[in-house]
Structures are given as C-alpha cells and as structure tokens.
Amino acid sequence: VTRNMGYALLAGLAAIVVLVSTAVFIGVGSEDGSLDGLTQSTGDSAAPASSGNWVGTWSAPAVAAEPNTRDGYHRMSIRNVVHTSVGGSGARITLSNLYGTKPLVVTHATLALAAAPSNPTAATGTMRRLTFNNSRTVTIPPGRKATSDAVRLNVPHAADLLVTTYSPRPSGPVTYHPYARQTSYVAQGDKADETSGTAFTQQSPYWRYLTAVDVWTHQTQGAVAVLGDSITDGITSSPGANRRWTDFLAERLRTERNAPRYSVLNGGISGNRVLVDGPRYSPNNGPSGLTRMQRDVLSRAGVRTVVVEMGLNDIIKPPRQNNPDRIVDGLRQLVKYAHARNMRVVGGTLTPFGGHRGYERRLDVIRQRVNEQIRSGKVYDSVVDFDAALRDPADPSRLRPAYDSGDHLHPSDNGFRAMAEALDLKLLKGSSPART
C-alpha cells in the first residue's frame, strides 16, 4: 500500500467512525434530555419531529415519603392534574421513586389534555399511552427516576394535563409533593386510559410520583426555574386557580411584548431552607436548597435562568440560623452551582413576616442583614426586591394588608401577583458571574 493510499484509507475509516458515532449519539441526551425527542416511541403517537427543543412546561419537586403508604398505591390508578406554562407539539413525563424503599413498577401510564380545568375527564382524542425505552412497563429502583419516551400531542399553554399511572404491586412509600393547591384523583384498578373520568371518585390534594412534564417546541427559548420555599410553592394561593407567583410570571412571559419566551418551572417546597435538610417524612421541609439544587432546578429541561426565593426559613425555623453570613454563603454556593452550568441567577430579597407567630425583632434584624447583602449586588447576578414589593409602607416589618394571606407570612393571590410584577423580565436574559 502506497503512502497516499494509506492516507486515503485512514480518511475513509475516520469518516466511517464519525458516521457511526453520529448514529450512536443522536437521540441519546444528557440528564436535561435535550436530544431525547429524536428517539422513536412505540406509544400511541409518533415522536415529534426533530426541529425544536425540549423545554420543561411544569415541575414539582419530590418532597418526602407520603405517610401511611408503606405498600404504595398498588392496584390503583393515580391521575395527577398539572398546569402547563408553555405549549408544544409533543410531550414526555418524569416519574420519581426518590423516597421509595422498593422498586416502583408502573405497567400503564397515560397522558391527556383535561376536558375542563381541574377535571379528571380527558379531552376527546387526546389520550396517549406512554412508554419508557419503548416498553409499556417501567421499573424504577428506590431513589431513582424515569423519563418517558416522547409522544406527539398538541399541548396548549396554560392548560391542564392529566398524567395517570397504574402500579400492580406494592412499591413502598410513595414519593409525593404535598401542597399541590390542585385537586388530583385516584381510582381502583387499572383506569389509566379511562377517558370519562367517572372511575376517579377519590380526590387528592397531592401530586404523586410525577415531578416533571416537558414539551417539544420551537417557539419557546428556554425555561426559568425557581428554587424556593412555601412562598414559591404557593401554599396560600387559591386552590385550583393557578395563582402562585410563578403562574403570574408565566403569564407575563407569554403575553408581554419583548419578554423572553421562557417557560416557568416551580421548584418550591414549603418549609424549605438553604442550609438544613428536613426529615424524610416531613411535608414541610424537604432536602435543603443546597442538596436539591441540581435535581430540582439545574437538571430540568431547557433551563436558562434560575430565580432563588429562599432563606427566611433558615432564620425562623429551628435550628434558627443566627448568623446572616452563613445564609448568604449558602446563597452564594447556589449561584456557583448555576454558574457551573452557565445559567444566570436572579435572587429575591427575604419578605416581611411581622405579626407571624414566629416573628421576633432580633430575627427580623437577621433578615434585614441578609437583604442588605443581596441588594449590594455581590450575591446574585441580578436582584428582584420582593421585600420592597410586599412590605407595608406604614410598617416595613409586615406585609401590606392587601398582600397578606392572613398569617402575616405568606402572600395572598394579590401578593403573589405583586411578586411577579416586581421582576424585571430583562433580568432573565443572558448569563454573567456574580461579583464577589
């Protein structure tokens, strides 16, 4: 073989390697699932076309193991009702067995549009059977999650979806999100593809197993993921009305001129703290922000910008953190995690809680010290001043009466709207390291 022939042979082999590598890696995405939409699905509808990208349209963190569910919900169908922030031409879901002690076996999973808000009835012609790696059955080990294959479904923005799962055997404690502020449903037996909703006679205030819904879209540029506590969780928002502050933010991003076309993903857990993990079975704590940042925020599909709304529980919940610098150091660490993924971080000031049963003047001083550092511009890339937006001008330690839900800690629906309106949407664009 001559030298020129040898070079030609090597070039040909290199081209083959490139082609084979391309064939292997197309359709296999990283944890954020950016390429999964190109894979084939054996569900009721074909996977969406390849032009577009995956973006999360809804999310809810796994909070704890649901009490009194030692055997799970075997031989029962769970129909979760969730609300989209943006639409798309295809969809996929993520199920979590984070707090399970046994494998979770799901033999039937479906996705449909709801015929009416908060209703278990599926809209005509929208029921889709879901598969996982081309199988109708998925087994999720304890502590793990599974993302379904893509199905073609025209998903509208600001619409309710029905995600139904059936498990035939005991699975151990159920991974759940307790403060959904949304009615979901349970039925006896395998009713996952039942469209009328009549079998779903048991109502539930929880989301179970389901932690994310993504859509395939070419109209949405990315996602804003919010890491927060009960204020972001919307624990005092009107049930079934989608009036959390993140819902109002999603509405602004959809409708306002020149707004970035982002979805909004809610990563709020009631009682959540920056520094301290909560107990396994507590519905009011969850893993700390530092512990769950990667799982609940950074790994969501299409995230471009992170908004952080937390820190107050570190001050008012035992063990109370008396050193504001410790809280700020934790917030800075959250920023570092996001910057490692080239994500921008907008941070919120800590809101007033005067009049709440946990209020003490010395604790409010700590809150103000944290806020001073946040406002200095040396913690986050940008700041949204939730404190200024919600406080009573006559008594800045308290919420404005029109924005107070009544417990003097959590906002009302009007307060949640004021939070969303306080955020300058231009701050959500781009990325830049925080100054130190």
Residue ranges of predicted features:
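Conserved SGNH/GDSL esterase-like catalytic core that processes O-acyl groups on lipids
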Residues: 58, 79-80, 103, 109-112, ...
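A cross-domain feature marking catalytic cores of carbohydrate-active enzymes
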Residues: 310, 349-350
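Surface-exposed amphipathic alpha-helices with a cationic face
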Residues: 331-339
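N-terminal secretory targeting modules
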Residues: 1-227, 237-240, 258, 431-436
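Catalytic His-Asp segment of secreted/periplasmic serine-dependent ester chemistry enzymes
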Residues: 282, 314-316, 351-436
